[in-house]
Amino acid sequence: MQYDNVSVADRIAEIKDTFSPDELTSVSSFVLLCSSGTLETTSFFEFLHWWALSDYSYKGCVEYLMKYKFRNGQSSFAINFFRESLATGKLKYEFNTPVSKIRDTKNSVEVTTRSGVTYTASRMICTIPLNVLNTVAFDPPLSSDKKAAADAGHINQCIKVHAEILERDMRSWTGVNYPNNKLIYGFGDGTTPAGNTHLVCFGGQHNHFEPEEDINQTLEALRGFAPMDIERVVSTRSSI
């Protein structure tokens, strides 16, 4: 297709003269909020796909991508799936068991763990994250396309930082600091049970950092949006 090999950086280069500096910053930062990659590694075609699913409007993007979410977080959604399966009495599971090898004999599938234990089944569903797929030996090997994807890795290097702050007037705030700040996009997400403001801020592959490794760097990135009195910080990553 026409846009299969076009990045967002390519497309922005074509139309950048139609933007003011502030508009260019807004467009670039919103794309990176969605992809958590870089403009060069974000597919323009995939972003068109998102735009179509959001009714071809920024309002749709906000409603479908940000406004509505699980009340108790995505982890609660996964936990409820697990509990429902467990309630059937037919689920067997094992945690903290890295896989080292998967062998498909056509009649059965063998999964061998790093500790040397082998499990056999008639079929298997593989949900190993892309960025760790190369740590597992497959027999027969992965297809060339899947191997190429595993070698490239996932471009999404999302950083999500939650901050509880005292400034109540920021509970409906939205801020952008691109390209210099380590957190690109942030917005107020209501109030905490203590009555303070809850901020959610995002970074990605651009100016990537690990929030939990240096709290002072994380605080500096948060205050890169606006002065704030920070009570508490929690960070998560979605880059596996």
Locate the predicted segments by residue.
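Short hydrophobic core segments
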Residues: 99, 118-133
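Short catalytic/ligand-binding loop motif for oxyanion handling, primarily in non-cytosolic enzymes
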Residues: 35-43, 77, 103, 132-136, ...
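General small-molecule cofactor/ligand-binding pocket signal
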Residues: 92-94, 119, 234-237
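Glycine-centered tight beta-turn/hairpin loop motif at sheet-sheet or coil-to-beta transitions
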Residues: 114-116
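C-terminal segments that line or cap access tunnels to active or ligand-binding sites in enzymes
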Residues: 132-240
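Active-site/ligand-binding neighborhood in enzyme catalytic cores
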Residues: 2-98, 137
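Short, surface-exposed beta-strand/loop "edge" segments at domain boundaries and coil↔beta transitions
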Residues: 40-41, 118-120, 206-213
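A conserved short coil-to-beta-strand element within the FAD-binding core of flavoproteins
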Residues: 92-110
